[in-house]
């Protein structure tokens, strides 16, 4: 699939549910109880939990989010990927599609505490050989935050991203996004632990970076991302280590 066709597919997947939702909402409601936003990004690499999903090549990404004043939300996010075909050339699955819904809100006297509860489905449409473990994954998550710091726990009752017999894997994520009050910069820091119920597949990932608000809905992010993932587990069929440390950048437009 060419990049232009892939971009069109991602934009179509992101925009169609949003268009349908907007048309169903009264004009006044779109700015009162209901909020609908979209996003489109170009990234030097798609890194998920520290592991490259595009074999260290650029990715195009996009999605939409709907939220209600009650705290209920749902959304869809999509990205170009290559890791499935990189692991087996008989696989043709160039897009990741994520669908999620949940409830998040603030609490406490100062309103600085927050919580987020939800479910996330990862879907990888494509063609797979008969003996290939499907990568479709469901996660249930719970998060709590205070100010710029947040902690999130995600639990997978299904197999995790194509690992056979990996049910009940989980991921713990500690993140901080601290506004620096200079040049529109925010400091981004993250450390996570991916527990995979498969020998030698668990690992730690970390990230340190900066995001700059460019105005008009644009944001530029740069970071260094790394892991301690086992090379024998996270090396693709081409012999390339998927968890290698890397400098990374993305440009995002929110609308």
Regions found by a protein language model. Name each.
Residues 63-65, 100-102, 118, 141-143, ...:
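Outer-membrane beta-barrel architecture
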């Amino acid at each position: 699939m060419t990049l232009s066709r892939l971009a069109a597919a991602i934009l179509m997947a992101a925009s169609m549910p949003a268009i349908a939702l907007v048309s169903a909402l009264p004009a006044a409601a779109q700015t009162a109880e209901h909020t609908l936003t979209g996003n489109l990004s170009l990234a030097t690499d798609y890194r998920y939990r520290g592991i490259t999903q595009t074999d260290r090549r650029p990715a195009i990404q996009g999605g939409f989010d709907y939220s209600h004043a009650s705290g209920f939300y749902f959304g869809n996010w999509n990205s170009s990927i290559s890791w499935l075909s990189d692991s087996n050339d008989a696989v043709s699955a160039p897009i990741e599609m994520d669908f999620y819904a949940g409830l998040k809100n603030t609490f406490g006297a100062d309103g600085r505490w927050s919580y987020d509860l939800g479910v996330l489905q990862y879907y990888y449409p494509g063609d797979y050989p008969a003996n290939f473990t499907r990568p479709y994954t469901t996660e249930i998550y719970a998060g709590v935050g205070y100010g710029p710091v947040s902690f999130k726990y995600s639990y997978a009752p299904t197999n995790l991203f194509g690992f056979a017999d990996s049910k009940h894997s989980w991921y713990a994520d500690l993140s901080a996004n601290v506004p620096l009050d200079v040049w529109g910069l925010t400091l981004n820091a993250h450390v996570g632990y991916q527990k995979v119920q498969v020998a030698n597949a668990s690992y730690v990932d970390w990230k340190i970076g900066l995001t700059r608000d460019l105005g008009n809905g644009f944001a530029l992010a740069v970071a260094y991302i790394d892991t301690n993932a086992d090379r024998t587990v996270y090396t693709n069929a081409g012999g390339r280590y998927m968890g290698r440390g890397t400098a990374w950048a993305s440009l995002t437009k929110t609308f």
